Amino acid sequence: TLAGEVGASFIASSADEKPEDIARRALKEADKQLADVLILDTAGRLAVDAEMMAEIQALHQTVKPIETLFVVDAMTGQDAANTAKAFNDALPLTGIVLAKTDGDARGGAALSVRTITGKPIKFMGIGERTEGLEPFYPDRLASRILGMGDDGHCCSDIARIHLSTLTGVYA
């Protein structure tokens, strides 16, 4: 599991278990382990319906989280805006996570979601690995939208390379 890859505990669940019951078990386990952070990840949705929104609202009421982040696929375009509006109307969102920013889409969904929700984009996902979750830098997204590339991301990648590797290249 992803939790195992990053060395985090996780709570297994079954399909017949209610989300609120899973969340209660997770809260108890987090308290028992004296955890500082508990992440509850709900299933991604392509369509929004009343039953699903009622379920997510009940879950939110059970957990009473400090942060409620809406994760949006940067490649979904107008659908992202519609889904963001529905979630923003139903929940007190505190921020946005823009996923799949390494794809072909330039990031127009980010502008729509930010405008509709009024919430800040806090993180962006580049690739599918946990190392690809980064703080959001508006100037980098603006460069991509304008077709100028993302030099900041390139530079930060280069900065991660160990100096001894570069020494061998230029020796």
Indicate where each model-derived feature is located.
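Active-site-adjacent beta->alpha loops and helix N-cap segments on the catalytic face
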Residues: M53
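Conserved phosphate-handling catalytic cores of large alpha/beta enzymes
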Residues: A23-L27, D31, A35, A47, ...
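A generic secondary-structure micro-motif detector
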Residues: A15-D16, D73
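P-loop NTPase switch/communication element
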Residues: T1-A15, D21-R24, A109
